[in-house]
């Protein structure tokens, strides 16, 4: 018996076709992963399956019920974890659980879930104050209330570190029964390759539905096959880098952190952090959620004042001359920091003004960078309406509009599909070859392999620094993900936490 049976379902939003005469089945008692390009229709599909959206045409049966007409009966039998975890950040951990228990009309006995997820000591903490990994666990706990027959997880591992991803997978696999069906959409192909079944989507259609092993025998081959199914990827010379004009300088280390310390009361968020980044180097800051990476980023950008130590940008102390130091930076934040109610052109014009480009030059600069980034066709579209990959491209254009010699990228590929990530890194490597110095944080360990050097950050301090090859050798690992987990575990063992 199948948990989900879909026949010829179409869903449109205005003139945009989200699902195009889509048909599929999802087997009962198995874990099924869903992957696909941005705007492939993954989230729309999941919402139709559980009754949050209605199909325009076609039929849907979930657990033998029609989600459109039997939503209440269906809701009692499913657990759903939306993107960004679906939490109320101004409620505590316990209050979130109580709220979802009321919605599901189930008993408010949370002791097992709190113990299982490790959240028991934090039940009175506001959800908004939790780390990414803890939010992830709370979102899962809310979805598991009532022991659902069908668990639907929409990109639950986006924006969290490898240890949190591993913990989430372990929690799910040890919680479900042999009869539980799990559907898990993901941007991580290693996750998709670990499930019983994998669905690959593109442009509102299912282009593969079967076991990962039937698609490819190895993880590397699986990635190649998924990319091929999604239309393939051919690396081309970066037009973005080709039109970038580097500001010449004789500064050996454009970015320097010297004994940076950041205290919040008695808590040390960053402890004596030191690193030097050469011209044209890609330097990665890796670490678990809550390790202090974002705090370090904020200090290097002048958005947070160090308690002690020095941050230098192109030799300029950012505490002494923040305006000059920031003029050398292009900054691309998590979630891209675009203004959703402004058009693509308006966002570019705004950032050009913020970065100090003379008013008389802004139109020409905006027109040129839009042409190089392939954004002109979207000029009049609101940025909130753009596909995720185009938002990413627009955010990078905003960061580069003043030709900065330094780029700071804070999880700039979070939630973006594998092909878009490869294109993005093609541009970054080409920019680095032209002399741009890049500081980047990421939770994708395959991206860490592209960095020239890496600082592994944990509990506010650097626990390892070097090339990817050196860190793997130090950990006795064959992949960066294995090295990441091993070095963190070693640090915990030294501290008596393991």
State the predicted function of each range.
Residues 151-155, 160, 407-410:
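Catalytic Walker B motif of ABC-type/P-loop ATPase nucleotide-binding domains
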Residues 98, 102-122, 349, 353, ...:
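Conserved ABC ATPase "signature" region
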Residues 58-66, 73-74, 309-317, 324-325:
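Conserved ABC transporter NBD signature motif
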Residues 140, 168, 396:
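Hydrophobic anchor residue at the start of the ABC signature
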Residues 50, 301:
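Helix-to-loop junction immediately C-terminal to a conserved catalytic motif
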């Amino acid at each position: 018996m199948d948990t989900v049976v879909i026949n010829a379902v179409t869903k449109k939003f205005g003139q945009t076709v989200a699902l195009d005469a889509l048909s599929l089945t999802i087997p009962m008692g198995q874990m099924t992963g869903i992957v696909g390009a941005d705007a492939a229709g993954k989230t729309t599909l999941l919402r139709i399956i559980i009754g949050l959206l209605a199909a325009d045409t076609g039929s849907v049966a979930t657990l033998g019920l029609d989600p459109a007409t039997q939503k209440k009966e269906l809701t009692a039998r499913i657990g759903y974890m939306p993107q960004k975890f679906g939490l109320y950040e101004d409620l505590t951990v316990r209050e979130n659980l109580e709220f979802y228990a009321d919605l599901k009309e189930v008993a408010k006995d949370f002791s097992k879930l709190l113990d299982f997820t490790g959240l028991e000591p934090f039940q009175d903490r506001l959800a908004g104050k939790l780390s990414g990994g803890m939010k992830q666990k709370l979102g899962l706990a809310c979805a598991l209330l009532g022991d659902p027959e069908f668990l639907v997880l929409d990109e639950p591992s986006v924006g969290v570190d490898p240890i949190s991803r591993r913990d989430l997978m372990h929690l799910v696999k040890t919680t479900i029964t042999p009869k539980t069906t799990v559907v898990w959409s993901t941007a991580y192909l290693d996750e998709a390759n670990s499930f019983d079944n994998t669905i690959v989507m593109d442009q509102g259609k299912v282009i593969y539905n079967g076991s990962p092993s039937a698609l490819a025998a190895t993880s590397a081959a699986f990635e190649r096959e998924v990319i091929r199914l999604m239309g393939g990827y051919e690396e081309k010379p970066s037009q973005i880098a080709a039109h970038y004009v580097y500001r010449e300088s004789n500064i050996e280390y454009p970015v320097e952190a010297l004994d940076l310390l950041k205290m919040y009361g008695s808590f040390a968020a960053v402890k004596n952090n030191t690193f030097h980044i050469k011209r044209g180097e890609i330097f990665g800051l890796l670490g678990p959620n809550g390790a202090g990476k974002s705090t370090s980023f904020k200090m290097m950008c002048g958005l947070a004042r160090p308690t002690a130590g020095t941050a230098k940008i192109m030799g300029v102390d950012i505490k002494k001359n923040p305006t000059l130091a920031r003029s050398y930076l292009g900054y691309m934040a998590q979630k891209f920091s675009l203004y959703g109610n402004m058009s693509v052109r308006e966002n570019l014009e705004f950032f050009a003004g913020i970065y100090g480009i003379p008013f008389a030059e802004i139109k020409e600069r905006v027109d040129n960078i839009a042409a190089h980034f392939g954004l002109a066709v979207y000029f009049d579209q609101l940025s909130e309406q753009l596909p995720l990959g185009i938002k990413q491209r627009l955010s990078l254009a905003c960061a580069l509009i003043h030709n900065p010699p330094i780029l700071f990228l804070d999880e700039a590929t979070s939630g973006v599909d594998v092909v878009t990530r490869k294109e993005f890194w093609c541009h970054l490597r080409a920019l680095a070859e032209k002399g741009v110095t890049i500081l980047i944080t990421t939770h994708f360990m395959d991206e860490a392999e592209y960095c020239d050097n890496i600082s592994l950050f944990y509990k506010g301090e650097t626990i390892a620094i070097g090339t990817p090859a050196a860190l793997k050798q130090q950990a006795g690992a064959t992949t960066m993900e294995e090295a990441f987990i091993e070095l963190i575990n070693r640090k915990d063992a030294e501290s008596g936490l393991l």
